[in-house]
């Protein structure tokens, strides 16, 4: 856009609109009809009507959402009003006199203003021209000066009965600070009392501007003005203004030949337009006040106006565009109990949406009219034909490009489906595309037609029955499938499908059946989760012939795989994904997803669990090239705000052309790229939030948030200013550093959001603008509401600077190559400072032949080949100075504090586990000993018969078992044997459980330790790479400094050799050229060396990580081997423990020991201590 010739002019108000027309305004609720005169102010800001008592009502044109005439306008329902308008008379022609104006803050909260004209067809002209004013791109994208002018127009229109401006209107217009309003009125010598009034003649535009300057002074603009005007002079000459425009307001990336800078004679036009002083205009001077209004003018719009018009190529295939899409369009609130309304289809289409959704269900008797509702919820119903009628009315009011109707068809009645098809044919008429275009047949490999080819057409997205004859519908839960089509429904004999096509469809059906069989193996919870994510979309029925015949270029098919889709190569097939499924595909196969969207279309919609109608962020799916990213238009949250803001561009057509890399099949695009994208120049964006104006109706502290939406590799940081120093919402100033987004990889996919918040995080206003639509320089940013409506008062004053991204390493070299003369002249000025650093300079300039002077003063050129040796030496020297970086070894990583601490904790856990196991083992043995003692005591009571004079003595457990003389020594009590077997079994189980616990705990420890080592290794390696990069940058800068010092040495030596000015200039140019080549060569060599070192470093780091991962398998194998060895010897250990513990109680099991009877000896049998065996078992475990 040229600075002096804005592309877009403000809307033109036709004379008859400003002159006015007589109407009758009626209200159905009150049954009142009032004669009014309807007008539009000459500047097109307000639609207003005046009653007979001179009372006036206003409607801001920016709030108008629709105008309707004839049968689409509201019709009185009150009998009283019907009698007033003689509606019962057949020759009344009432519909030719109607006019309805629809306005509201969003798409749900609407107000209808109804008028009836005295003449026929008057309402038609008013409806068309008023809507054209409301939808004009400059109505909501007007410059700051226009919004300030709207305030003046409204003040002058709201007059009291005496024809004067009430002062109280000023207080209502600027409610934030009444005292400041009074002071500003006083400064302009105007009345300031609450009950006073001002004569409109005393308040012209010049006085109004003075009032604004007093109410909202702009010290920040005064500072800018001071930095460019002549010292001690209160004005800026046209030369100074030209310099300011070319340096600050001009995009530095523009080519000076194709886009020449401003010239003083052109700038004089701006001074004539904005300078309030006539004397200054004659002298070509601009005052500070003129500077303020210049920065508020259309020449300094923050937007590139040409992007608001249709400026993109609209002849590409349909799948090469992002398409503004809606989900569950009929709902006005939540997904469970919200109201449904046909009006939502009008509002969504008027906002620029080109894809709407219709959830169709079978109507109930007796009418059996198909309905639209959200199935299995408490949402209300609307008739299908009402929705179709609304779409037919509003489809092409704001955009001529094709509309896609996305049917979610649950109507399993052939008769009702036929009725749906008939409604579409009759109401849409010629706009309904029923047959493919001749040049774009439905064949594999044939691309889709373009939006231009489909201009003014409506396309149906519905399941298509690919074969002739009806297909039986699938049963929904609790329903019964109906029979075949009735005879009244025609069936085509030839559907145009070849045998190859039928085979492909059969293959898809087989795959779908296999997937359904696999889904049958899922548990109930997984099936419920899948159904809740998809909502009712998975319950669609099969299309019958009538509806199927309407489907052509948008044929929904169940997604199978990217490979399958690529093999079939059918551009007319579209698949729908929930946000979760799309995110999964994007995460696992992002590049395949992008390639899929190059060939055919995809639709993404919110998951079924978003019962509050909230939205997901659409940016991630735009990054993958998904065309129809459907959102809930009734919820104006941040995702919807971004969608509304971006689709406002390209003429609000609902179609945005994707980037070339997302369209060309020979190019690969990875949305997760973090480095660079081939051939795409990254952008650096810097934004400084300077001040705000009229941000709130209350005196509060405010702050500003700045956020970037784009690729995952873009800078994702959200910046925020501090709170304004004082509670001042009229003109707060933030003196902070600029917010910099250093590397925006693909500017075409990025957008900037700037939001103003009140203290306490209350939303005040925001703006979302694509990066490619921004202009560099100082700009006033007019804010929008949450529903993207233009706000009259609030604005921000910002400074934007956009330039091509250049790494710091190449910054100096880029400047030198872009403007070598300017760069080296600047370096010459630094030579004096460097002279003391460089020390004594050599007498000879090069190592070859010295420069000499002839007797006549003519210079002699330096020896041949003097540049190359220096360049080579410097490059080698730079390469030698770069040391090869090292990475941490495996041993060093093992000694890291975090790893050692974790190992100690694991060792402690293992010791505790083994201690508990040993204690349990000991308890089992002691319990067995106690049970054995009890058995032997019982046996002793039956068999022992002590003598008369015998003395009672305490015996050990084994002594209590007395063997009778007739009883063999090798026979034992069977209960004792049973006790022994049970004890061995319990010990066996305890040992197995203990060994398994140890193995499981060791495996867990190995996993945790390896994960910890991997985490610390990655952190350390990231720090190593960062240090390496910082060191590399430092080395490069030092090398450049050395080369610069060397250049200065050569120039100093040259001046000593010859005094001829011409020769000096020539030799100086040679030295500078040589220096540039030398720097380029040295930087190239150093960069190659650094890249090699970085590759080696990354290879070592990768090898280290692989070693750590290999350790996990080794440790687990070792733990498993130990476990298997212990389990193998457990049985023998158990028997040995039992035998050793009770060896004297089971004499038959003692190895190589003679049988002995306790009866034969009076001595006690020896008993092993219990604790010693338990200790042995603990040490073994």
Curated annotation (Swiss-Prot):
Residues making up the signal peptide according to the UniProt record: none
Catalytic activity: a 1,2-diacyl-sn-glycero-3-phospho-(1D-myo-inositol-4,5-bisphosphate) + H2O = 1D-myo-inositol 1,4,5-trisphosphate + a 1,2-diacyl-sn-glycerol + H(+); a 1,2-diacyl-sn-glycero-3-phospho-(1D-myo-inositol) + H2O = 1D-myo-inositol 1-phosphate + a 1,2-diacyl-sn-glycerol + H(+)
Limits of the PI-PLC X-box domain: 312-463
Compositionally biased intervals (Acidic residues): 503-525
Compositional bias annotation for Basic and acidic residues: 874-883, 1150-1159
Biased composition (Polar residues): 850-869
Self-association and partners: Interacts with RAC1. Forms a complex composed of at least WDR26, a G-beta:gamma unit, and PLCB2.
Domain of life: Eukaryota
Cofactor: Ca(2+)
Keyword vocabulary terms for this entry: Calcium, Coiled coil, Hydrolase, Lipid degradation, Lipid metabolism, Metal-binding, Phosphoprotein, Transducer
Region of interest: Disordered: 465-534, 847-890, 1149-1181
Protein name: 1-phosphatidylinositol 4,5-bisphosphate phosphodiesterase beta-2
Note: The receptor-mediated activation of PLC-beta-2 is most effectively mediated by one G-protein alpha subunit, alpha-16.
GO cellular component: cytoplasm; G-protein beta/gamma-subunit complex; neuronal dense core vesicle
EC identifiers of the protein: 3.1.4.11
Active site per the UniProt annotation: 327, 374
Domain named C2: residues: 666-791
One annotated GO molecular function: G-protein beta/gamma-subunit complex binding
């Amino acid at each position: 856009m040229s600075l002096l010739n804005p592309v877009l002019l403000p809307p033109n108000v036709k004379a008859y609109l400003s002159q006015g027309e007589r109407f009758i305004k009626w209200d159905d609720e009150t049954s009142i009809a009032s004669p009014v005169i309807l007008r539009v102010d000459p500047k097109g800001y307000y639609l207003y009507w005046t009653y007979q008592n001179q009372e006036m009502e206003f409607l801001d044109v920016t709030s108008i959402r629709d105008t309707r005439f004839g049968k689409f306008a509201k019709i009185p329902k009150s009998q009283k009003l019907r009698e007033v308008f003689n509606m019962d008379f057949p020759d009344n022609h009432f519909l030719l006199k109607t006019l309805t104006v629809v306005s509201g803050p969003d798409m749900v909260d609407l107000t209808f203003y109804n008028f009836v004209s005295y003449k026929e067809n008057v309402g038609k002209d008013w409806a068309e021209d008023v809507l054209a004013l409301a939808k004009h791109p400059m109505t909501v994208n007007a410059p700051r000066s226009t919004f300030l002018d709207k305030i003046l127009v409204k003040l002058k229109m709201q007059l009291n009965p005496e024809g004067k401006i009430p002062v109280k209107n000023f207080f209502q217009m600027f409610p934030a600070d009444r005292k400041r309003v009074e002071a500003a009125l006083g400064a302009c010598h105007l009345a300031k009392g609450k009950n006073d009034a001002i004569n409109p003649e005393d308040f012209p535009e010049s006085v109004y501007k003075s009032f604004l300057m007093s109410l909202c002074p702009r010290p920040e603009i005064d500072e800018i003005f001071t930095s460019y005007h002549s010292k001690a002079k209160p004005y800026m000459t046209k030369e100074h203004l030209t310099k300011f425009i070319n340096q600050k307001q001009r995009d530095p990336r523009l080519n000076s030949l194709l886009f020449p800078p401003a010239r003083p004679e052109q700038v004089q036009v701006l001074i004539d337009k904005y300078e309030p002083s006539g004397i200054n205009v004659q002298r070509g001077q601009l005052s500070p006040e003129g500077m303020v209004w210049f920065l508020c003018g259309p020449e300094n719009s923050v937007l590139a106006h040409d992007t608001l018009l249709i400026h993109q190529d609209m002849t590409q295939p349909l799948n090469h565009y992002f398409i503004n899409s809606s989900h569950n369009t009929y709902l006005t609130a939540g997904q469970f109990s919200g109201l449904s309304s046909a009006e939502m289809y009008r509002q969504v289409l008027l906002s620029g949406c080109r894809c709407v959704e219709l959830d169709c269900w079978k109507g109930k008797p007796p009418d059996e009219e198909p309905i639209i509702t959200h199935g299995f919820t408490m949402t209300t119903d609307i008739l299908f034909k009402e929705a179709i009628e609304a779409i037919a009315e509003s489809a092409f009011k704001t955009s001529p490009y094709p509309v896609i109707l996305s049917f979610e068809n649950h109507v399993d009645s052939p008769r009702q489906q036929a009725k749906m098809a008939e409604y579409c044919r009759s109401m849409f008429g010629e706009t309904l595309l029923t047959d493919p275009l001749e040049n774009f047949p439905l064949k594999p490999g044939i691309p889709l037609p373009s939006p231009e080819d489909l201009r003014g057409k409506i396309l149906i997205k519905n399941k298509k029955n690919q074969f002739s004859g009806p297909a039986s519908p699938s049963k929904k839960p609790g329903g019964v499938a109906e029979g075949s089509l009735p005879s009244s429904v025609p069936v085509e004999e030839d559907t145009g499908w070849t045998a190859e096509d039928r085979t492909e469809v059969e293959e898809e059906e087989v795959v779908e059946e296999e997937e359904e069989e696999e889904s049958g193996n899922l548990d109930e919870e997984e099936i419920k989760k899948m159904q809740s994510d998809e909502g009712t979309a998975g319950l669609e029925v099969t299309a019958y012939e009538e509806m199927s015949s309407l489907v052509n270029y948008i044929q929904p098919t169940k997604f199978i795989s990217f490979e399958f889709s690529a093999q079939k190569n059918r551009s007319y097939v579209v698949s729908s994904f929930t946000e979760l499924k799309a995110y999964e595909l994007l995460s696992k196969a992002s590049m395949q997803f992008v390639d899929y969207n190059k060939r055919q279309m995809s639709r993404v919609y919110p998951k079924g669990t978003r019962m509050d109608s909230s939205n997901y962020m659409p940016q991630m799916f735009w990054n993958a090239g998904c065309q129809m990213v459907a959102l809930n238009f009734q919820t104006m949250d941040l995702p919807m705000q971004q969608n509304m803001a971006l689709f406002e561009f390209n003429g609000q057509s609902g179609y945005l052309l994707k980037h070339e890399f997302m369209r060309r099949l020979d190019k690969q695009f990875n949305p997760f790229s973090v480095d660079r994208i081939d051939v795409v120049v990254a952008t650096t964006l810097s934004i400084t939030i300077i001040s705000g104006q009229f941000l709130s109706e209350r005196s509060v502290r405010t702050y500003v948030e700045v956020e970037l939406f784009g690729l995952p590799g873009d800078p994702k940081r959200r910046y925020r200013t501090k709170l304004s120093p004082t509670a001042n919402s009229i003109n707060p100033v933030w003196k902070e550093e600029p917010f910099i987004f250093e590397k925006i990889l693909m500017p075409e996919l990025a957008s900037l959001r700037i939001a103003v918040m009140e203290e306490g995080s209350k939303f005040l206003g925001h703006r979302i603008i694509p990066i490619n639509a921004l202009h560099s320089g100082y700009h006033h940013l007019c804010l929008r509401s949450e529903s993207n409506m233009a706000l009259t008062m609030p604005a921000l004053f910002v400074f934007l600077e956009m330039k091509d991204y250049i790494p710091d390493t190449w910054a100096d070299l880029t400047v030198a190559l872009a403007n070598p003369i300017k760069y080296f002249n600047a370096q010459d000025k630094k030579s004096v400072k460097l002279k003391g650093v460089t020390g004594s300079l050599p007498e000879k300039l090069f190592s070859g032949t010295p420069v000499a002077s002839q007797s006549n003063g003519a210079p002699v050129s330096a020896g041949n080949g003097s540049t190359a040796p220096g360049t080579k030496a410097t490059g080698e020297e730079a390469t030698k100075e770069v040391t090869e970086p090292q990475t941490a070894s495996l041993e060093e990583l093992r000694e890291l504090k975090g790893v050692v601490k974790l190992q100690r904790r694991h060792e402690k856990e293992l010791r505790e586990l083994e201690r508990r196991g040993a204690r349990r083992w000991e308890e089992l043995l002691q319990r067995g000993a106690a049970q054995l003692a009890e058995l032997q005591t019982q046996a002793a009571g039956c068999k022992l018969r002590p003598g008369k004079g015998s003395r009672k003595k305490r015996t050990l457990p084994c002594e209590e078992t007395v063997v009778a003389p007739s009883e063999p020594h090798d026979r034992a009590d069977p209960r004792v044997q049973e006790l022994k077997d049970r004890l061995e079994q319990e010990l066996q189980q305890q040992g197995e459980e203990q060994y398994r616990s140890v193995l499981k705990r060791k495996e867990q420890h190995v996993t945790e330790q390896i994960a910890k080592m991997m985490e610390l290794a990655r952190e350390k390696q990231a720090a190593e790479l960062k240090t390496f990069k910082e060191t590399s940058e430092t080395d490069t800068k030092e090398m450049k400094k050395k080369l610069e010092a060397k250049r200065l040495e050569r120039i100093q030596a040259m001046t000593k050799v010859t005094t001829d000015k011409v020769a000096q200039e020539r030799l100086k140019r040679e030295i500078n050229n040589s220096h540039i080549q030398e720097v380029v060569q040295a930087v190239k060599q150093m960069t190659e060396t650094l890249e090699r070192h970085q590759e080696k470093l990354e290879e070592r780091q990768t090898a280290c990580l692989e070693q750590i991962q290999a350790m996990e398998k080794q440790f687990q194998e070792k733990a498993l081997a130990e476990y298997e060895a212990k389990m193998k010897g457990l049985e023998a250990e158990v028997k040995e423990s039992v035998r050793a513990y009770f060896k004297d109680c089971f004499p038959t099991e003692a190895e190589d020991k003679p049988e002995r009877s306790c009866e034969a000896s009076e001595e006690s049998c020896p008993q092993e201590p219990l604790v010693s065996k338990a200790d042995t078992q603990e040490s073994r475990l």
